[in-house]
């Protein structure tokens, strides 16, 4: 989309933060209004993360106005809220390409702009990185400032508190801003509290506070009295005791939509020494009523009509794999009150909304705490319950030690329902589910299943749920299922594949939902086709039979080729001293950027024609 300077006259003056800082402070509210309208206009035309960015407009403007970015280093946690940041840092005219193939990255990305200090996508990394950046800046001795912006969801993760605990110990000069959008602005966020925030962030208060500590450090009764008096005064309006105990100077909460107030507070805080903590209150979806009323639905949106405020309904195709999982969960819970379902803050995405409403006593959203989710599930299993951990492939990476140490070593019957496996699409490198088969396959006693359609997905969930000899995992992709008939639930024989087509010379061994593409390729090649179903344990007898009857084998999976299911087939053949040529087809050895799922698969060659051509070229 072309930029309309007449529609956004103030924003038109800002193509860099240097230009932003030339504006008179009085014009910043108008700039915020135009920036918010431009964000609505661009995202509604192109799709993307939406409600979070609407809530951080004033904060973004104030930060770039006060701090000398990119010299001063600004770090966004996760990055959903960083669209206004991208617009103000030279990417305004390309914002309509965000999340598209060849377009702007969906999150702050180091390779895209010098303003993007840390590449992000997963939550709760900003403070840890910020401490390292602040320590490096201090050694540089150029008065470079470090600011981290983290949301109220991301700060619940253990990593954020580990980082703050460390910051309180080594005391780097840095600012952590908590963007708290869980509630509307409360009554105590008004003129009095904004005035107090500026007072508490001012140099006079800081000097008196530190000076008083030094003067009275050797007079314990007076020091304790001063501490209690300070806590009493601040406690009337400041819910920051926890952050103070971690070693931060806490300021807030303040109105995150008062851009002029934010500018004043940030100016006061910029030169303070040691770790500072600013708590701001914002409203997710601010300035666009439909998003304010339903920020979860408007968190990430397709193209939509901003006038009506209604998002396009699903085209009515087949249900998603997430819904297939959610329906199975409800069906199982209706018969078994031992089922316990766990999600790390992904209720909607994992298809668990209906389950959470029907079976609230069996549903646990542990927030952004993947490590805790897995070990919590281990505890439930020890207690005689049957835990199901619903988690995205990319987020299970964050709990790898817990899978090994707390579940697998103890052979606890925990079922992992791994959503978003394989190519995810528009969220790019940080969200592709490329590695789960590789990092789970090496864990002893782990059963790993790869359904080829929704019926197999249900059967495998049922099989894993009733498997009591250790952990099991079922991985399925983002997107709609195929529309096959759903059969009555029954346990599958562990580690057994199914021959789908008999052919000559070449056998295709498929793992997962690429079976339709593999079927077309097998027909074109007159190849044998097998739905392997299990990555672990592999059907070794079937592999050896296929190797004995064919000149070559081809493995197909939507996982990294290195260490994936195909590698397991190679290992079986080598161990059995059966040196048959094997072609492993899967995800290449690089991080896959944003684009649609179809675009990514076409580029990689995971289409029917792509698979066929790869095999023909290899055999030639």
From Swiss-Prot:
Keywords: Isoprene biosynthesis, Magnesium, Metal-binding, Thiamine biosynthesis, Thiamine pyrophosphate, Transferase. Its EC number is 2.2.1.7. Thiamine diphosphate binds at residues 80, 121-123, 153-154, 181, 288, 370. Its cofactor is Mg(2+); thiamine diphosphate. It is an enzyme of class 2 (transferase). One of its GO terms (cellular component) is cytosol. Homodimer. Belongs to the transketolase family. DXPS subfamily. Catalyzes the acyloin condensation reaction between C atoms 2 and 3 of pyruvate and glyceraldehyde 3-phosphate to yield 1-deoxy-D-xylulose-5-phosphate (DXP). This is 1-deoxy-D-xylulose-5-phosphate synthase.
